[in-house]
Amino acid sequence: MNKINIGDILDFTTEKSARKAIFKEGRLDTGLLLYAPGQTTPDHKHSDIDEVFYVISGEGTITINNEEMRLKEKDIIFSPHGETHGFNNTSSANWVVLQIKIRD
């Protein structure tokens, strides 16, 4: 069993959004997506990965198959493999999203 304090791995000093790995075991891969205001991840898709995104703090938008949706603290969303998705922190605060990847 491993324990990590999320506060210990938050880092918003990079120019681009960042992913901080948490745990990786077998088909499961978890990490934090960190977005300072204005930072984005371009639309992309995975052919063999389902993903769950849970907003820990802040708010922003996720675009799924060209449909934009606002996400805020405590929102959770599932993105199955093959679905196009991207992120944009449109707020004035940092945005922290827990990402859970499940490989086929």
Identify the role of each PLM range:
Residues 40-41, 58-64:
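Short beta-strand segments in beta-sandwich/barrel cores
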Residues 48-50, 55-60:
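Glycine- and acidic-residue-biased ligand/ion/polar-headgroup-sensing regions
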Residues 1-28:
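A short, N-terminal "cap"/entry segment at the start of jelly-roll beta-barrel domains
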Residues 67-81:
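Short acidic-glycine-tyrosine-enriched beta hairpin
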Residues 81-104:
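Ligand-binding loop in jelly-roll beta-barrel domains
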Residues 31-46:
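Conserved short histidine dyad/triad with adjacent acidic residue
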Residues 26-28, 59, 67-69:
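Well-ordered beta-strand scaffold positions
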